[in-house]
Amino acid sequence: LWDAQPYNVEEFTAGKVVHMEGRREVYNNTPQVNQITLRLPTFGEPNDPADFKEKPPVNPSEVREYLEQMIFKIEEATWQRVVRALYRKYNKEFFTFPAAKTNHHAFESGLAYHTATMVRLADSIGDIYPELNKSLLFAGIMLHDLAKVIELTGPENTEYTVRGNLIGHIA
């Protein structure tokens, strides 16, 4: 909003549904929309932000149940205790945060969904290559992205935290 007034800033906050009319144009070989009108929904128009959010392809409770079962397939007791303790500590965040701000699994509960799909792949690969240590695969995958609950701000209007920007995936 190039010419936004103070009341626009208060009215059009992140997380609200707005109705916009605009014109698609190209600037520097990049498509953009030039806004013509912007307004809040009127009575009877869709106004629930949840209706416009990407949803996980499976029910998050199924993902939770699957991961809980897979934690018990970690046969090395110390690794299993570490995974269980950290999942307990970050339970709420892990099962609600996206896996990323943009790109892959950038939706609520995307982090848990992404982790579950990777564990499922590891389980299949472990069947094909029995010499692989499935306990190590499962524990490593389950812990690999867990720090995203510290790197990202949460499921709504996701941004990277200071730690996420400065340290991120390298720690």
Descriptions of predicted regions:
Residues 21-23, 56, 108, 171:
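Metal-centered catalytic cores of metalloenzymes
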Residues 68, 122-123:
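Amphipathic alpha-helical segments within well-ordered protein domains
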Residues 70-77, 105, 109, 128:
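Generic amphipathic alpha-helical segments used as scaffolds and interaction surfaces in large
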Residues 103, 113, 124-171:
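Divalent metal-dependent catalytic cores for phosphoryl transfer on phosphate-bearing substrates
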Residues 49-55, 105-108, 161-165:
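A ubiquitous short alpha-helical element
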Residues 79-121, 143-151:
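A short mid-domain helix/strand-loop element embedded in enzyme catalytic domains
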Residues 1-50:
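OB-fold single-stranded nucleic acid-binding module
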Residues 30-98:
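Extended, charge-rich, solvent-exposed interface segments
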